[in-house]
Regions:
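Phosphopantetheine-dependent thiolation modules in NRPS/PKS and related acyl-activating systems
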Residues: 1-34, 38-43, 48-75
Length: 75
């Protein structure tokens, strides 16, 4: 699992946010496009791309994309 690829997969779940807005330190819940549907898309992306299951509570516990990456990598 690679952080760069994870960020690309994460960014692909957003339609209107430019790719350059996504970095390891991005606080994803502050993005204008972030909402409950996007959260579900991220949960599905983690399941589909990495064969790992996360919950909404797991997602809420993360602040940055790197936090989420580290959590998923630890599973």
């Amino acid at each position: 699992m690679d952080l760069k690829d994870f960020i690309e997969n994460f960014a692909a779940e957003f339609d209107e946010t430019p790719a350059e807005a996504f970095a390891p330190e991005t606080e994803f819940k502050t993005l204008d496009e972030w909402n409950s549907l996007t959260a579900l898309s991220i949960i599905a992306m983690v399941d589909d791309s990495y064969n790992k299951t996360i919950t909404g509570a797991n997602l809420r516990a993360c602040t940055t994309i790197e936090d989420l990456f580290n959590f998923v990598a630890s599973l």
